[in-house]
Structure formats: structure tokens, C-alpha cells
């Protein structure tokens, strides 16, 4: 029923008697829900998953048994670190949450666009996110926070050296890879199980490897919603994006003999690229994901959509990965915070959210410093995987690919204070003296140019992380 206007007249009943108006105002005050603290900027679509290969020898999951079987699903793509209004092409880890409506309940795949992450110790997560978000003093981006954290947590270098290459910028969701990252246990009726890592490879190919940092910045300025727009328009015109699903399988008896810990999320399950002398875990294709329908009501269908690694189905169990264990608690807890005032049921009813809610943090030192009492000690393979990646880049593409990594690192680090720069150089030297020397040289050239031109150092709020 449409509301009639409230016309001010003397000797009439007061407005507080207009219960329709009060209801409209109270609904307006409550129609928004809290923003996700991570993965705030996003978009989504509906689709289906089709089994293409028989994997019944390693799997007893109903959704994956039977070539040709199709399962409806809904997915949400997102950035990670910054707020809902940020640009999608920023140098950031990207996310993809998928909710499969199986006959045995919802099964969620909570993925990122790289096969490894910054940390293996979940106690570090709040500080990691604070380091990438806005300075609590200035409310601007501050590279000092980010690089101070990286230097104190060298297990992050594997992903940092990926993010600052051309792989760290992205121009559309349709060609983004997605990795569950964690090992899960796929169980069989006899009680046996395999450790399995699942990932999705875009059939449209990557969209970022020929892009420079300047290209990414131009895209962010010209259309900060470009990736969402591209996905929506592609689906509307019938150009449906597809991904091939792969599984990497490890027998639990073989896991101790591998040269890395499959429960350490800062390492990837190598399928033949690097480390060059490392254990290789072959991949097996088993299905195709297709996104083929846009939502009708974005807020109720996508923004209220939630995911959790704990949303499992019979035949799947979580592994002992500490990051996975922490996420299984944190995601449902975040849903209770974020959706408590919005109990409406979206078409694909979520049970868990795609965010974490870190509490307030006390800073005893300079306000932008990010520290934690729970640093886990660095191990040699933390540097080894980063070193192998750095040395592999020229073989992966060409020398220019590695050169741009150096330029991107130098551009960002040049915006930090001297104390942080020195920490970063020392940390990089543990990976490769060539890496440290080239980054130092690039930073010094930028600082000299800025001094010669009498140009003040770029403000943190304009930082290009």
C-alpha cells in the first residue's frame, strides 16, 4: 500500500500518531546491515556445477558421484582488505565464496585467488588485516603499517612476491582462479580418507598478466566497479564464464614424506612449477562450474549471502590446518554480528558468513605499528618458497615479469619511513640478496628523484600498495 504524504496543518493530530510514517522511518533506520570487515566489496551470480569425470575412487560425496550430475549454486566474488566503496582492481587478495545446494545440505567452498596465504598462525589474522586497512590515526592507507608487518612475518613473503607481480592486479572476475587453500579430508565408507585440495581454473584464461601497475591504476580510476560490471554484462548477453575444478590428492601415509607441510597455508601444493626439486602433487579434473544468472535483488540475494568453511556435507571432514580450524569458528560468529538485525531469508539461505570480526586493539607504541604477541617463528622453507618463486618468474614469463615485480615493490616501499625500509631490506636479503639489492636500488632512485624535484613524499592516503 502506498503511503500518502504528511501535510503540516494546525489543530491536527501530532505526527507521532501517524504509525505508518513511524514504521517507514524505523524500517529505513534498519534497512542496512554492518559491512563485512573483510571481503566487503563484492558481487555475485547464480550457476551450476557439473561433474565431468569419475572420482569415485577417492570420493564418497553425493554431489560429486555420477558423471553429468548437476548441482545449483550461488557465488560471491570480493576484494579483501578495504571497504565496500574501494576499487576492485587494487593490489589485493580476491575471494570467491560458493554455496552448493546439494541433496545433503549446503556445501560451501570459500576460496581466494592464490593457492597460499600470508599466515599459518590464526592468531596473526587481526593484525594482518589491520596492516592492510586504514591508519587509525589518519584514516588513510599507510604503507608503513603494511611493510612493518611483512618484515616481522617472513612467512608472508611467498604471497607478497606474488601480489606485487603482475599476478597481483586483476581486471575481471570471469578469469580469476580460485583455490580452497586448505587440505580437507575426503572420507570413504570403510573409514579411510585422503587429504584433498580443490581449486578452480578459469577456462577463459587469466586477465592480468599483461597489465602494468599504471594500467591497473587507470582501470581503478576510470571504473572502480569494472570487474562487477564485466561479470554482470557478460552473463546478461549469454557469455557465461566457466571454470574447471581440479583436485590434488595426498594419502595420509605419504604426507609426512613430502618436503612441505600440507597443513601450512603459506605453501602451495606444487603441481610441477616450483620449487624445482620439490614434491609434485598431480591434479585431477572432476567438474565444471558455470555462472549463468544474475541476481534480481542484489542486497537480499548477494549482500546477505554468507559462507563458512564449516558448511560441509557427508564425505567431507576438516583437516587439522589451524587456519581452517579458526575460520570454522570465526565465520559463523561474524554472521551473528553482521546479520543479527536482518533475519530475512535470501533465496539461497546462508548459514555462515564470509568475514571475521576482530575486536578492538590496543597500541602501546606508535599508533600505526601493527604487532602481535603470538608471532610464530620463521622457518627456512618460508624463505625457500619465496626464493624459488622469485627465481622462477623469468622462466614463467620473461625477465620483464621479474623486473616489474621489483618496480612495484620499490614504488610501494619508497613511501615508508627509513626504519621500516631497513627492516624490509634485511628480510628480503634472507630470500635473495639479488632481490634485496634491486629493491633497495629502486627505492633509492625514487627517493633521489623526489628530492631533486622537491616533491614531498607521497601521502599514505595515496599509497599504491
Swiss-Prot record:
It comes from the Eukaryota. Pathway: Alkaloid biosynthesis. PANTHER family: CATALASE. This is Catalase cnsD. The gene is cnsD. The active site is at residue 39. PROSITE patterns: CATALASE_1 (PS00437), CATALASE_2 (PS00438), CATALASE_3 (PS51402). GO terms for molecular function: catalase activity; heme binding; metal ion binding. GO terms for biological process: alkaloid metabolic process; hydrogen peroxide catabolic process; response to hydrogen peroxide. GO terms for cellular component: mitochondrion; peroxisome.
Amino acid at each position: 500500500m502506498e503511503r500518502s504524504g504528511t501535510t503540516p496543518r494546525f489543530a491536527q493530530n501530532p505526527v507521532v500518531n501517524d504509525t505508518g510514517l513511524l514504521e517507514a522511518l524505523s524500517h529505513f533506520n534498519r534497512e542496512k546491515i554492518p559491512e563485512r570487515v573483510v571481503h566487503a566489496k563484492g558481487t555475485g551470480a547464480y550457476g551450476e556445477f557439473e561433474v565431468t569425470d569419475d572420482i569415485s575412487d577417492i570420493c564418497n560425496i553425493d554431489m560429486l558421484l555420477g558423471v553429468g550430475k548437476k548441482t545449483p549454486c550461488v557465488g560471491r566474488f570480493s576484494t579483501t582488505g578495504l571497504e565496500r566503496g574501494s576499487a576492485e582492481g587494487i593490489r589485493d587478495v580476491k575471494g570467491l565464496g560458493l554455496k552448493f545446494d546439494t541433496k545433503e545440505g549446503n556445501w560451501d567452498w570459500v576460496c581466494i585467488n592464490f593457492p597460499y596465504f600470508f599466515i599459518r598462525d590464526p592468531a596473526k589474522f587481526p593484525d594482518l588485516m589491520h596492516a592492510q586497512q586504514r591508519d587509525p590515526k589518519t584514516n588513510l592507507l599507510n604503507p608503513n603499517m603494511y611493510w612493518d608487518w611483512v618484515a616481522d612475518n617472513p612467512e608472508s613473503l611467498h604471497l607478497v612476491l606474488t601480489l606485487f607481480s603482475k599476478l597481483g592486479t586483476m581486471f575481471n572476475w570471469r578469469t580469476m582462479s580460485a583455490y580452497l587453500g586448505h587440505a580437507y579430508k575426503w572420507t570413504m565408507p570403510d573409514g579411510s580418507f585422503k587429504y584433498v585440495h580443490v581449486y578452480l581454473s578459469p577456462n577463459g584464461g587469466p586477465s592480468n598478466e599483461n597489465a602494468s601497475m599504471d594500467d591497473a591504476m587507470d582501470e581503478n580510476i576510470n571504473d572502480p566497479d569494472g570487474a562487477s560490471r564485466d561479470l554482470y554484462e557478460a552473463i546478461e548477453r549469454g557469455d557465461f564464464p566457466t571454470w574447471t575444478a581440479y583436485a590434488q590428492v595426498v594419502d595420509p601415509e605419504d604426507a609426512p614424506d613430502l618436503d612441505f607441510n600440507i597443513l601450512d597455508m603459506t605453501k602451495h601444493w606444487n603441481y610441477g612449477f616450483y620449487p624445482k626439486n620439490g614434491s609434485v602433487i598431480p591434479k585431477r579434473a572432476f567438474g565444471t562450474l558455470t555462472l549463468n544468472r544474475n541476481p534480481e535483488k542484489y542486497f537480499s540475494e548477494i549482500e546477505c549471502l554468507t559462507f563458512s568453511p564449516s558448511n560441509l556435507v557427508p564425505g567431507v571432514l576438516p583437516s587439522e590446518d589451524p587456519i581452517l580450524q579458526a575460520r570454522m569458528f570465526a565465520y559463523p560468529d561474524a554472521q551473528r554480528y553482521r546479520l543479527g538485525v536482518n533475519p530475512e531469508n535470501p533465496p539461497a539461505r546462508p548459514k555462515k558468513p564470509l568475514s571475521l570480526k576482530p575486536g578492538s586493539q590496543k597500541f602501546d607504541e606508535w599508533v600505526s605499528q601493527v604487532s602481535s604477541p603470538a608471532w610464530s617463528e620463521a622457518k627456512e622453507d618460508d624463505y625457500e618458497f619465496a626464493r624459488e618463486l622469485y627465481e622462477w618468474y623469468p622462466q614463467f614469463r620473461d625477465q620483464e615479469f621479474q623486473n616489474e615485480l621489483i618496480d612495484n615493490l620499490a614504488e610501494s616501499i619508497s613511501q615508508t619511513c627509513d626504519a621500516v625500509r631497513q627492516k624490509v631490506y634485511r628480510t628480503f636479503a634472507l630470500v635473495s640478496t639479488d632481490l634485496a639489492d634491486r629493491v633497495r636500488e629502486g627505492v633509492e632512485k625514487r627517493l633521489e628523484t623526489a628530492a631533486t624535484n622537491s616533491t614531498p613524499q607521497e601521502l599514505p592516503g595515496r599509497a599504491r600498495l
